[in-house]
Curated annotation (Swiss-Prot):
Protein name per Swiss-Prot or TrEMBL: Protein MGF 505-5R
Induction: Expressed in the early phase of the viral replicative cycle.
UniProt function note: Plays a role in virus cell tropism, and may be required for efficient virus replication in macrophages.
Organism listed in the record: African swine fever virus (isolate Tick/Malawi/Lil 20-1/1983)
Protein family (similarity comment): Belongs to the asfivirus MGF 505 family.
Length: 502
């Protein structure tokens, strides 16, 4: 349980003016050589009614003086124990530092608060489980180059590599530069991997400086081709859209080849592409190759327009390939652009293929995008044996079954493809079966079947009329005349057989 004195010490915020030094000492609110202590708010203390400082600064001072009693008071006032430990280390009060450290058992949480390399090292030494490698790694993280310089000879090759990578990832440029200039690093090229990972051009520049000024012989010894390395970096940068990386790399060599530009196209980095297309005289074949890649990569409208502009929107040489890519990658953006810009029509060659395997929803959007009439879609669907599209598109045009029958019948009259015409008639008959037509409409449909030699459908509708006890002799005679006139011999035979039963 807390004593009354401890409760008072913790919670008293205002001391009366008449409180003398003796009473303050008895309450434990007195700091030798400084005077009375008074808590101000949550974060500050007032010393001898005169000086206001933060609780943590007071803790550091008390620790430096080795004043455990004041340290404990300030900790009750919710001060940070880290500052007390730092102060104890600064004042060489090791016993107090160890006593306080025993309450946290992790020196690494304190290190970011320390600026002095000597105190940094002393603080790290509080943790007996840590070694020199751990000290140096943390020193690098917190910009303590002098510690690295002091202990570099005690580090193994693996430790040096780890420290170098930590320095790169922590963006400690001075340490990275010093290590590259003064220590043999097993894999200095890791600096480039990290530079790209962090997209940090300063680190990339340091890497090139080290590569060409300090480790070029080492890299050649490892059979690494510098030009290939630079080209690889250009390709990476292009693929990531890092134009400033590319410009930095080009200061040291390399060339922006078609492979490099392909990376920019593949990931749709138009600004990179635009920058180098303006400055390089590429062959037309190369730009055509980039355009085809852009189609396959589903690049943006701006990227496609950019490449097309360098071809003056002329695609005669790659027309077939564009159609092939449009079908293979199921993209129509290039077709839209060419149609709107130069009225180049690539719709016809792909329409049949698209209708052959795309859904109604997709084709409805396609029809809207290219302002295609439904009649054209339905006829093409008939050619491609897509009855589902015929039904859905015709229903979209005509909601009422009777209107739909009339609409589809008109399409049959203008349909030249034999298989497509037969499918339309088949669809019409199915629609008729699902509808309730009056005899007058059924007569019209029977004549329609006769005109188009649809024997099965004609026989079916005549049977339906007979079941309703409707006299169809005149209809049969009329249709027989149509069949004779058009030389539909099988239909003639069908009509004559039907007449025999009437």
């Amino acid at each position: 349980m807390f004593t009354l004195q401890e409760i008072c010490r913790k919670n008293i915020y205002f001391l009366p003016d008449w409180l003398n030094e003796h009473v303050a000492q008895r309450l434990g609110l007195y700091w030798e050589k400084h005077g009375s202590l008074q808590r101000i708010g949550d974060d500050y203390v007032l010393i001898q009614q005169d000086l206001i400082i933060s609780i943590n600064e007071a803790l550091r001072m008390a620790g430096e003086e080795g004043n455990d009693e004041v340290v404990q008071l300030l900790l009750q006032w919710e001060g940070n124990i880290f500052y007390a430990i730092i102060g104890a280390l600064e004042g060489d009060h090791d016993s107090l530092a160890y006593k306080l450290y025993s309450q946290i058992r992790d020196c690494h949480t304190i290190l970011p608060l320390i600026q002095d390399p000597k105190i940094f090292e002393k603080c790290h030494d509080l943790d007996e489980s840590c070694n020199i490698s751990c000290l140096v790694l943390n020193a690098v993280k917190h910009d303590m180059l002098c510690i690295l310089q002091e202990y570099k000879m005690l580090l193994s090759g693996g430790d040096i590599q780890e420290v170098f990578e930590i320095a790169c990832r922590s963006l400690k440029y001075d340490i990275v530069t010093w290590m590259g200039q003064n220590i043999a690093i097993y894999n200095p090229g890791v600096i480039f991997d990290i530079a790209f990972d962090k997209m940090n051009v300063s680190l990339l520049s340091i890497g090139y400086t080290l590569l060409f000024n300090h480790h070029i012989n080492h890299i050649n010894h490892e059979n690494i081709d510098v030009n290939s390395l630079l080209t690889q970096h250009l390709e990476w940068a292009a693929g990531m859209g890092l134009l400033h990386f590319m410009l930095e790399t080009l200061k040291y060599g390399g060339d922006v080849t078609i492979i490099v530009l392909s990376a920019a196209v593949k990931y749709d980095h138009r600004k990179v592409l635009d920058y180098f297309l303006r400055r390089k005289n590429l062959y037309r074949e190369d730009i055509e190759e980039l355009l085809l890649l852009a189609i396959s990569a589903d690049c943006s409208k701006k990227t496609l327009n950019l490449l097309l502009s360098y071809l003056n929107y002329s695609i005669d040489n790659i027309r077939k390939k564009i159609l092939q890519y449009v079908k293979e990658y199921e993209t129509t953006l290039i077709i839209k652009i060419l149609w709107k810009k130069k009225k180049i029509n690539l719709i016809e060659p792909i329409l049949a293929d698209f209708i052959g395997y795309h859904s109604y929803t997709y084709m409805k959007g396609f029809m809207r995008d290219f302002s295609i009439h439904p009649e054209r879609i339905i006829k093409m669907a008939a050619r491609e044996s897509r009855e589902d599209l015929i039904i859905k598109f015709s229903k979209n045009v005509c909601k009422e079954p009777k209107d739909r029958l009339h609409y589809l019948k008109n399409l049959v009259y203008t349909m030249k493809h034999k298989g497509g015409k037969q499918l339309l008639i088949y669809t019409i008959h199915n629609l008729y079966k699902a509808s309730c037509l009056e005899s007058k409409e059924m007569f019209k449909l029977a004549r329609f079947y006769a005109r188009h030699d649809a024997r099965i459908q004609f026989k079916s509708i005549c049977h339906d009329l007979s079941k309703q006890n409707i006299n169809i002799k005149n209809l049969l005679l009329e249709c027989l005349g149509i069949a004779i006139k058009k030389n539909y011999f099988q239909l003639i035979e069908t009509i004559e057989m039907t007449m025999n039963y009437e």
